[in-house]
Amino acid sequence: MAYLPLTQQHLLAILPNCRPVVGVFLPALNRAMARFEINTRARQAAFLAQIGHESAQLTKLSESLYYKDAERVAQLFKYGFDLNHNGRVDPAEVEFARGYLRNSEKLANRVYGGRYGNGPEASGDGYKYRARGLIGITFHDNYRLCGKALGVPLVEQPELLEQAEYAALSAAWFWWDRNLSEKADLGLFDGISSVINGGGNGRAERRE
């Protein structure tokens, strides 16, 4: 199937707040979508809705873990803060979370350390391999797989995903790797959202 190029008008109709960066991202997105067969308006609309939500309409390419509310931290990051593994937020856990407020690096190392190829909390891998790009590639193992697919050294240079070209390519690779175009073809929009964000955060926004 021939690639149907995305136009600036179409991109701004879906993501109106991306106007300041549209000149950088339009060619990058066209290259990425052509490479990974996001090649119909239905596929493109679904893809753009997802990356628009994940990246605040192409304006946020690196995850911020700067929080000021300890209870919110304990609620969001069960892996690092459900200390007694009971599935509830307890006062002791909220108190423990206070030590991670207003410190993105410390919090990332806590919640992402020791998982999916990351070294332990003290290694710094949690922050090094935090979510980046338009769809939030996270963890050493996913950086490695994505880098191998794209032919770029993402493990050694994870910050490459903060550049428009690789931010777009990594998102399109993730889409292709999870067979999300098939779901878009079938109109399974919630199924796509579940793959990208299992908690369903922002589902209504993605549908707009």
Annotate each language-model stretch with its function.
Residues 9, 27, 31, 45-48, ...:
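Solvent-exposed, polar/charged alpha-helical surfaces in well-ordered, non-transmembrane soluble domains
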Residues 34-39, 156-162, 184-185:
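Short, mixed-charge amphipathic alpha-helical segments
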